[in-house]
């Protein structure tokens, strides 16, 4: 049976075109469309439920810099630091008081973070270790007064000596007291200076202090932030425009901040860091607004990575060089005076938190080398101190991440406060934190079996179709080539047989010589002709025939 060459060629070509168009154009569009419809913050959706109440805790680590030579530093010596940690906590995130605006396609909510001490993961530490840090009230308060309200220095100095009798520039206290339980602030004195100092506690200006009775407060770095309001956000739901999913449009009911001297730095860029839009391009970066810094930060693509066998993109970020980057000059105290810009790798938080604090990467990683040289005990490296995010772009899923940040005191001598008079001027690391997440198989399997399984099936299908179509195209090409380059032997033989049949029906002419015998012995011709032919009817052309015809 003959193979239908034309049909085979057309079918193989159609299969090849279909595999290309469906595998690389139609299927990705269908998949992206399905993801865009599923990944929204519309009430009742699975993503909305996971987003509003994270069903697993994040890992939160504290690393504290213990000052081992506090008395020497008080006299101007170089600080020697000892890193103590990690102190491990489970951080639970939830959002409450959710309000949807269907017209604007937004949802407003209040963020809440709850920290629970994980004693098992903290071992061999217990949280009861004594740490020596800059006095968390005296030093920031004294420096702020010297910079902004120098005329009140004498009153503040006297008030500090009453509220904190015999206090030094550095305080020794247990980790849990400094960070969660609180250190005692006694405002029971009737002295005017003490009452004036305690006014900032009673009015709530010191956000880290909690009033326990009429005359006493407890001060801690994190106690007030634990299981309390962490800010009111308004973000896009992504129902009308999936590309805007999670985008912050308001914080504290304001469309922009009023903290930095230039409007661009006050703009909200990115999400609340708990959700990202699907279908991002790697060059877009991952942007999120960070209330602790009063600033939006963008992570940039670093390299390809993988998580539990699934491909992902590795992103990282840093605080940049505010002085060198013109776009960041609005984070300087005076954008027109670059001398007011913080050193490379740091950010001045004074305008954000109301105190002389600086943010940086842990151990001043990627920062100005002078910052590291000013103290002993730092060892910056990428593995331990860089920020990273392993992100799946198509679904907008962060597989794992480590957000790291260090808080430093912008220390300087304060002439009006005796214990601080001889302090060196430098940026002193106090502690750094890491907020980490690593999705387990329960959640990665959702991505694996809905996204990657579909991609795998599509990949196998399209390459199988391409393979079959190429085989068909090559076979049909072979058939066409064989047809044009070879003889149709059967047709030729049939044509020759027809000619011989006609010749055999002709009546023979009489012999030219009557005396010549009309019977001749035929010459025996070897059968060297084409197989299937009759040697008698097809004599070899090079042999002379006994019988000749006259014309």
From Swiss-Prot:
Q: What is this protein identified as?
A: Sensory neuron membrane protein 1
Residues of the region (Disordered) are 502-551
Q: Does the keyword Acyltransferase apply?
A: no
Tell me which parts of the chain lie in the Extracellular compartment: 29-459
Q: Which gene encodes it?
A: Snmp1
Membrane side Cytoplasmic: residue ranges: 1-7, 481-551
Q: A GO term (biological process) for this protein?
A: cell surface receptor signaling pathway
Q: Which family does it belong to?
A: Belongs to the CD36 family.
Q: Which residues form the signal peptide?
A: none
Extract the Pfam families matched here. Answer: CD36
């Amino acid at each position: 049976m003959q193979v239908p060459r034309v049909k085979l060629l057309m079918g193989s070509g159609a299969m090849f075109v279909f595999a290309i168009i469906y595998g690389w154009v139609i299927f990705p569009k269908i998949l992206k469309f399905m993801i865009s419809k599923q990944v929204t913050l519309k009430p009742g959706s699975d993503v909305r439920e996971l987003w509003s109440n994270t069903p697993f805790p994040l890992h939160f680590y504290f690393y504290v810099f213990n000052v081992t030579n506090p008395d020497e530093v008080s006299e101007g010596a170089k600080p020697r630091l000892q890193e103590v940690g990690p102190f491990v906590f489970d951080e639970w995130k939830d959002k409450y008081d959710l309000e949807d605006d269907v017209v604007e396609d937004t949802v407003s909510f209040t963020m809440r973070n709850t920290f629970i001490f994980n004693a098992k993961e903290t071992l061999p530490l217990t949280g009861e270790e004594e740490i020596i840090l800059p006095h968390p009230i005296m030093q920031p308060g004294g420096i702020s007064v010297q910079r902004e309200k120098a005329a009140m220095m004498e009153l503040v100095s006297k008030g500090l000596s009453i509220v904190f009798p015999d206090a030094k520039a550095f305080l020794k206290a247990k980790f849990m007291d400094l960070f969660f339980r609180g250190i005692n602030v006694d405002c029971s004195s009737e002295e005017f200076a003490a009452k004036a100092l305690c006014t900032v506690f009673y009015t709530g200006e010191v956000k880290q202090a909690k009033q326990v009775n009429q005359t006493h407060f407890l001060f801690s770095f994190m106690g007030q932030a634990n299981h309390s309001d962490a800010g009111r956000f308004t973000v896009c739901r992504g129902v009308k425009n999936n590309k805007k999913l999670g985008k912050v449009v308001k914080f504290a009911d304001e469309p922009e901040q009023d903290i930095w001297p230039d409007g661009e730095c006050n703009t909200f860029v990115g999400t609340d860091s708990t959700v990202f839009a699907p279908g991002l391009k790697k060059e877009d970066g991952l942007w999120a607004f960070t209330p602790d810094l009063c600033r939006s930060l963008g992570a940039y693509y670093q390299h390809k990575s993988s998580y539990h066998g699934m491909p992902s993109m590795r992103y990282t970020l840093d605080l940049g060089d505010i002085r060198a980057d013109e776009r960041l000059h609005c984070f300087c105290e005076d954008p027109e005076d670059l001398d007011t810009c913080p050193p490379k790798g740091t950010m001045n938080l004074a305008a954000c938190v109301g105190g002389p604090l600086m943010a940086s990467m842990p151990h001043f990683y990627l920062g100005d080398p002078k910052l590291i040289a000013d103290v002993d005990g730092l060892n910056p490296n990428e593995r331990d101190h860089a920020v990273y995010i392993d992100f799946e772009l198509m679904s907008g899923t962060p597989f794992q991440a480590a957000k790291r940040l260090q808080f430093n005191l912008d220390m300087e001598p304060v002439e009006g406060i005796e214990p601080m008079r001889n302090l060196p001027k430098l940026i002193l690391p106090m502690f750094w934190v890491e907020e980490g997440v690593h999705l387990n198989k329960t959640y990665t399997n959702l991505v694996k079996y809905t996204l990657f399984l579909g991609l795998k099936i599509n990949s196998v299908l399209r390459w199988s179709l391409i393979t079959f179509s190429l085989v068909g195209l090559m076979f049909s090409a072979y058939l066409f080539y064989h047809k044009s380059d070879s003889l149709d032997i059967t047709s030729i033989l049939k044509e020759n047989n027809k000619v011989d049949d006609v010749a055999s029906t002709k009546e023979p002419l009489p012999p030219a010589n009557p005396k010549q015998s009309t019977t001749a012995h035929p010459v025996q011709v070897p059968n060297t002709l084409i197989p299937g032919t009759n040697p008698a009817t097809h004599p070899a052309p090079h042999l002379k025939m006994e019988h000749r015809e006259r014309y």
